[in-house]
Curated annotation (Swiss-Prot):
Keywords: Cytoplasm, DNA-directed RNA polymerase, Nucleotidyltransferase, Transcription, Transferase. DNA-dependent RNA polymerase (RNAP) catalyzes the transcription of DNA into RNA using the four ribonucleoside triphosphates as substrates. Its main location: cytoplasm. It comes from Saccharolobus shibatae (strain ATCC 51178 / DSM 5389 / JCM 8931 / NBRC 15437 / B12). Pfam families: RNA_pol_Rpb5_C (PF01191). GO terms for molecular function: DNA binding; DNA-directed RNA polymerase activity. The keyword Cell membrane does not apply. Disulfide bonds: none annotated. It catalyses: RNA(n) + a ribonucleoside 5'-triphosphate = RNA(n+1) + diphosphate. This is DNA-directed RNA polymerase subunit Rpo5. GO terms for biological process: transcription by RNA polymerase II; transcription elongation by RNA polymerase I; tRNA transcription by RNA polymerase III. Belongs to the archaeal Rpo5/eukaryotic RPB5 RNA polymerase subunit family. The lineage of its organism: Archaea, Thermoproteota, Thermoprotei, Sulfolobales, Sulfolobaceae. Transmembrane segments: none annotated.
Amino acid sequence: MRGSSNRKIDPRIHYLVPKHEVLSIDEAYKILKELGIRPEQLPWIRASDPVARSINAKPGDIIRIIRKSQLYGEVVSYRYVISG
């Protein structure tokens, strides 16, 4: 392929990709307690997702996603990392 190389592109630098961060165990416990749910009840994200890979998320981790919104300022959501 023309121009191919072994460079890896970090998907987090694209302006449409919201901020993703892996929660610590304490943060995850606090969020789950606030929401009154088990981790498996959160929406899922696969460990093979490009952003999950770029932040080194492992199955069982919980990711906080912070999106900027013109209407609401910031919208925070959470994802449970599954294998795959």
